[in-house]
Design a protein with these regions (language model features):
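Transition-metal
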Residues: 1-129, 191-218, 243, 302
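Ligand-binding loop in jelly-roll beta-barrel domains
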Residues: 72, 80-85, 116-119, 164-184, ...
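A short beta-strand-loop-beta hairpin characteristic of the jelly-roll/cupin
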Residues: 119-153, 256-278
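C-terminal amphipathic alpha-helical segment
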Residues: 185-251, 257
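Hydrophobic, well-ordered secondary-structure elements that form the walls
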Residues: 246, 268, 280, 300
Length: 307
């Protein structure tokens, strides 16, 4: 796939310097590695459908995706480079988004920590016990009382359900698997200016959708640490997606038995069924692809729809 990139006030240069993407600027926040969204759609990099938009392929060749139902391609895959803190934010569920955001999908997402600085933390959840306490904390700017920060390290995996207050802190790079939605409600943005003006906040919507009380951390921290070698391991299966991780040393194989399988190479290089792949590559293995033979030293994060 040919990715889509975004420039953000919190972005940096790792997407170019570390992942090798040819994109200018020192504020590159996101690589949309697999995307078929009105705000950005990838094009096919090579092969039979070279140059076509993923969104068009989804509409015209649904057989490649196991005849999966749905008006829009269901998932969106990003690499996010947070040089600075992202806003404290929350996403709506499908019902709220459909009613208030012109029929959009809601946004469930999950994060695989690709890299982070020592002693890094994420904002996951909040400390309000009741909705009244939440409103008081938000309306009076009691952010240190409100937000819940957790330490994280490379290799951690975190699930972010709709309604979860969250933020990626500076110095963290993640691979994000999410519903195909671009709806974000900002709760707090550190009073930063963008083009000389504060960025828009969405206090009413945020208070509408934030889950109170917050889910326990055990519901969010799904997996942590090193994985087994040469084995496609499931990290999570939820309502919208399944996510897998594999660390390949020398060679490995598995059967692509899903309607389709999205693959992101997040470390190293090698070959997949004889085709060269490297860090930063994103691709889709279509329905009935069959056996996947991997050679080299590389790390993959893969995903598909829940069945």
């Amino acid at each position: 796939m040919n990715p889509v990139f975004t420039h953000n006030i919190w972005g940096g240069t790792k997407l170019r310097d570390v992942f090798g993407y040819k994109i200018e600027g020192d504020d590159i926040g996101e690589c949309w590695g697999i995307a078929a969204h009105p705000n950005g759609t990838c094009t096919i990099a090579n092969g039979t459908y070279q140059g076509e938009k993923l969104s068009d392929l989804w509409e015209q060749h649904r057989e490649l995706f196991g005849d999966t139902k749905g008006k829009v391609f269901p998932l969106l895959i990003k690499i996010i480079d947070a040089k600075a803190d992202l806003s404290i934010q929350v996403h709506p569920n499908d019902d709220y988004a459909a009613e208030h955001e012109n029929g959009s999908l809601g946004k469930m997402e999950c994060w695989y920590i690709l890299d982070c600085e020592p002693d890094s933390k994420l904002v996951i959840g909040h400390n309000a016990k009741t909705h009244e306490e939440l409103e008081d904390m938000v309306n009076h700017g009691r952010w240190s009382d409100l937000i819940r920060e957790i330490p994280v390290k490379k290799g951690d995996f975190i699930q972010i359900d709709p309604g979860t207050v969250h933020a990626i802190k500076g110095g963290i790079t993640i691979l994000e698997t999410q519903q195909n939605s671009d709806i974000t409600y900002r709760v707090y943005d550190y009073d930063r200016l963008s083009n000389g003006k504060p960025r828009q906040l969405h206090i009413k919507q945020s208070l509408d959708v934030i889950t109170v009380p917050a889910a326990p951390l055990s519901d969010c921290m799904i997996a942590s640490g090193e994985s087994k070698v040469n084995e496609l391991q499931k990290l999570i299966e939820c309502k919208y997606y399944k996510v897998f991780h594999e660390k390949v040393v020398s060679e490995a194989a598995f059967n692509q038995k899903f309607p389709f399988l999205i693959v992101s190479v997040v470390e190293g290089s090698g070959t997949l069924n004889g085709t060269a792949v490297k860090k930063g590559d994103h691709f889709i293995l279509p329905y009935q692809f069959g056996e996947v033979k991997l050679q080299g030293n590389l790390e993959l994060v893969a995903s598909t729809i829940a069945e």
